[in-house]
Design a protein with these regions (language model features):
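Histidine- and acidic-residue-rich, metal-dependent catalytic cores
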Residues: 1-131
């Protein structure tokens, strides 16, 4: 996370999300990295980016496993409430238009715009709903 945060910190318009980038691998239960932050020690943006990144990872094909369906990914997110994911952030994500995001992904979004734009889209969508 520190390399990405360093790059984004050089872009004035992106500085506000740098704390979220630095913390998006933290877990609510404190077993994340790089700092082992617990619960509210993790900035809201970090919780949102972490969930969006995890959803993208779960619903993407990997060399070692096929992509999960949206339903499987949502079930995994629910299973990890209070350990990996913040309950409020996850609730808003699940209640948001996840299926629209999924449809956009399936419609060539990933190839056309790249994964980072999908994570950004999901992050913005969840961030807007939480406010």
């Amino acid at each position: 996370p520190s390399i990405g945060a360093g790059i984004l910190n050089e872009i004035k318009q992106m500085r506000d999300i740098v704390p979220g980038i630095l913390c998006h691998h933290e877990r609510i239960d404190g077993r994340g990295y790089p700092n082992g932050l617990i619960g509210d020690e993790i900035p809201l943006m970090g919780k949102i980016i972490g969930l969006a990144d995890s959803f993208d990872a779960m619903t993407s094909d990997r060399v070692y496993r096929p992509a999960m369906t949206v339903e499987e990914a949502i079930a995994e997110i629910k299973k990890c409430l209070g350990t990996q994911f913040d309950g409020n952030v996850a609730r808003v994500f699940i209640e948001s238009d996840v299926y629209h995001m999924w449809a956009v992904m399936q419609d060539g979004f990933r190839e056309k715009y790249g994964t980072n734009n999908l994570v950004e889209y999901g992050t913005l969508a969840v961030g807007t709903l939480i406010r």
